[in-house]
Every structure is written in C-alpha cells, then in structure tokens.
C-alpha cells in the first residue's frame, strides 16, 4: 500500500486547472481585502504628518513671539497672524516638507494683525494676557482647518482636521 501511494505521488506532474483557478481566486479575495486597508493606513500616515507639521509651525510661532514682542497681540480682541514664510525667512523653522509632495503654500512673509489672504499661518490670540495659538496649514489640495475653514486651535489638532 505504501509503495502504491509513493508511485502515485511520483506520477503526479502538477496541479490541475481547477486547482490553479482556486488558488488565483483565493489570492484575489485576499488582495481585495488587504489593499484598501493598506491604502487607508498610508493616508492616515500622511494626515498624521500634516498634523505634526502644524504642531511644528505653532512651536516656531511660540519661539518667534518669545524673541519678538511685536508679535504679541495688542489686546484681547485683536489677534496677530504669522505666515509660514515669515517663520521660514526669520529662521524659526526650516522648510516644511509636505507629505503629499505638493509643497505648502507659505503665504506672503507677513506678520501682523491683518489676516493673510492666502497661504499657511499661525493665529496668535490673547485672553486676559494668556496667549493661545491656532494654525491654518494648506498645500492647495488638503488643509488643516476646522469645518468652517478657520484655523484649528493647538489643543484640537488631529487628523480629523485635515480636509
């Protein structure tokens, strides 16, 4: 009996067409499940990188305020806006790498009480002398902003704000 089984195994040349089709179908099902999951992970990683860049921008603005008192809001009702280009030009931050590969819109290099018309910026506001920071970071396709299109406060930064 053992010799008969060995003989049959030696005579078997390969897999049948049905067996090959079954393997291909199984691999197709596995890839159909796995690919969307992997793409979702990649997108979430990019969103997390945008959030990290926004935090880096806020930290740079904090350094700028410490070094330049003219960047502090004049009163509780008037915020100060500091563009990404201003932070880069003054050496508070290196050029920020956009995970989407497009490059961030850096703005016009201004800092003051006028809201920038375009580009990325940090908004510095004061409440009873306590400074708070909000960030708007855009690359033309995706931006860090709230549902109304306004800058996101520092304590609310998350991947949900990447729109």
What are these language model-derived features?
Residues 66:
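Mobile, glycine-rich extracellular loop/lid and propeptide segments
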Residues 13-39:
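N-terminal single-pass transmembrane signal-anchor helix
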